[in-house]
Structure formats: C-alpha cells, structure tokens
C-alpha cells in the first residue's frame, strides 16, 4: 500500500479477527547475516500474516539474501498460506530483486467521490452539514451535506486533491487538514457573506501552503537519503552509512539538514521517514531525476 495509509495496521486487525499467526520481520542482524532461522521457524501449519515486508530487507549487498530465500520458499509453497503487506516503494524495488510475477492486490486510488465520502465520514459526529469556504474570497469551495450520496458532481477542489495526492487518501487528508482555518483571512474583496447558513457550520480553507524545499547544496546526496528512506518504509539513522556511500558523520549532517527543512524526521519507533508535508514534492523531484518510483508515482 501507499505510505501512510495504515495497511500494516489493517493486516494486524485482520490477523486478530481470523486467528492468523502474525509473523514479525527479521532483526537487522538476521538480515545482514542472511540468517535462515527466521524462515526455518515459519508457521507453515497455519494461516499467517506478514504485514511489513518492507522491514525484511536492506538495499545492501548482504541485505537481500534473506528476502531472495523468502521469495523462493514462498513460490515453491514451502511457507504455506498467508497474506503479505508491503509498502508500495519497497515493492517496486523488490520486483527488481525477484522479477517472477506474484499475485498482488492494492486499494484502488481515491478519486473525487471517494474523497468526498471520506470527508463526510469524518464529519458525521457533528450531525450538521459543513460549508467549506475559501478563507480569502469567502466563496464556497465545497458543501458537505447530511448524506454521503449527495456528493457534488465534478467538484474542482476534490478532483485537484485526488490528482495532487495521486489517490493516496492519507496525503489528501493531510493537505486538507493543513489548509483548514476556523476564521477567514483578511481580504479586500467585497460582497462575500462570511456568516454561517442556518443549520450548517462554516469552515475555511486557506491556499495550499508552500512545499518544503530540498537544500540546494549537496542536492543529490539529500535525494539519495530521501529515496532510501522511501524504499525501506523508514530507517533508523544508524543504518544509513551501511546503505549509502557516506560516512556516519555525513549521514547525520544530511539528516539534520532534511529535518531542519521539514523534509524528514524520526517517528516514535525511532525510524526516519519522509514527512507528510514533503511526500508529494519529494516524489515530484525524484521523478524528475529518474529515481525508481512506486507504481502510484509512475502511473499517469
């Protein structure tokens, strides 16, 4: 699935509901040592779920042997039956490691109608229609009614959201929330009525904020770090020197620059990831520099 969409959590819930065995990824030591013990202990006699395949390899000469062995056993049926979850960027890389086609499913990208239903589902507890207006002009951008079926046809705002996010609902929702305001912004325009309609609530949408910018100095090096973070679904900082042609001190400097620019940062699990604010512009830059992209960024 696309980054931020919660595919791993969904598979965890699925495993609990159907009594499947949850398989944890190998440790970093096991990955680098190509320790087959992780695979030898596989629960082949029961349904299993591996929700995070992206955590089972490293883009390193010694970090892909274990995933090759995994695919070999999987294709031969020696691992039994199970469900595998994988980040879309990692999957793009792994398809180069193991080019034999494997059946894969992904959620359909969110288009404008689906985004409308998503926004409606988040607003249901208010039990009031919501009128979203432009924070400067006061013009209605979109009105969300009581019924999820009463979605506006060809709404330009939702169509643009779907296109900008490439169907990633987490990205679309982040951008939407980032623009929300409780009060309109000062404007010289006249004739707009800022008052709430009877029975509805008004919220304001500001212009899309400026994107974070990749530092111009050592630009290619920063892009290599960002791409590596995407391919692995996030990484601990200590692993970067093993995956990139830079010493530890330089990797730490690059991460500090990316963090300062709002492009990446550490999560609660200690792994560094591309930030939500930076995901879209980073993907655009990587596309322009001919980096390997996931299916969603290549499409269209």
Describe the residue ranges of each PLM region.
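Walker A/P-loop nucleotide-binding motif
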Residues: 1-11
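Conserved P-loop NTPase "ATPase switch" module shared by AAA+ and STAND
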Residues: 23-67, 84-86
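Sensor-1/coupling segment of RecA-like P-loop NTPase cores
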Residues: 55-97, 104-108, 112-115
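Conserved small helical "lid"/interfacial subdomain of P-loop NTPases
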Residues: 105-154, 164
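The conserved phosphate-sensing helix
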Residues: 150-177
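Winged-helix-like regulatory helical subdomains adjacent to P-loop NTPase cores
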Residues: 170, 174-250
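Short amphipathic alpha-helical interaction segments
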Residues: 245-261, 266, 277
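Short, amphipathic alpha-helical interaction segments positioned at domain boundaries
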Residues: 278-300
């Amino acid at each position: 699935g696309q980054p931020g969409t919660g595919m791993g959590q969904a598979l965890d819930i699925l495993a609990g509901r159907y009594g499947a065995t949850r398989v944890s990824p190998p440790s970093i030591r096991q990955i680098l040592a190509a320790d087959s013990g992780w695979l030898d202990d596989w629960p082949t006699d029961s349904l299993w779920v591996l929700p995070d395949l992206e955590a089972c390899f490293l883009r390193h000469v010694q970090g892909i042997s274990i995933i090759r062995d995994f695919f070999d056993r999987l294709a031969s049926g020696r691992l039994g039956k199970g469900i595998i979850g994988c980040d879309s960027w990692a999957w793009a890389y792994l398809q180069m490691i193991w080019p034999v086609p494997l059946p894969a499913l992904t959620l359909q990208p969110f288009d404008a109608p689906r985004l409308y239903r998503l926004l409606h589902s988040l607003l249901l507890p208010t039990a009031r229609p919501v009128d979203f207006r432009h924070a400067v002009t006061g013009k209605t951008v979109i009105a969300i009614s009581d019924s999820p079926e009463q979605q506006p046809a060809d709404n330009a705002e939702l169509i643009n959201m779907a296109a900008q996010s490439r169907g990633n609902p987490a990205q679309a929702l982040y951008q939407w929330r980032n623009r929300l305001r409780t009060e309109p912004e000062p404007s010289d325009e006249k004739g707009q009525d800022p008052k709430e309609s009877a029975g509805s609530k008004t919220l304001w949408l500001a212009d899309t904020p400026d994107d974070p910018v990749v530092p111009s100095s050592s630009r290619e090096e920063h892009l290599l770090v960002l791409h590596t973070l995407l391919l692995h679904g996030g990484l601990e900082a200590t692993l970067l020197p093993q995956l990139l042609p830079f010493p530890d001190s330089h990797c730490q400097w690059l991460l500090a620059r990316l963090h300062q620019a709002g492009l990446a940062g550490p999560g609660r699990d200690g792994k560094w990831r591309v930030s939500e604010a930076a995901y879209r512009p980073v993907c655009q830059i990587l596309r322009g520099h001919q980096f390997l992209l996931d299916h969603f960024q290549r499409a269209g």
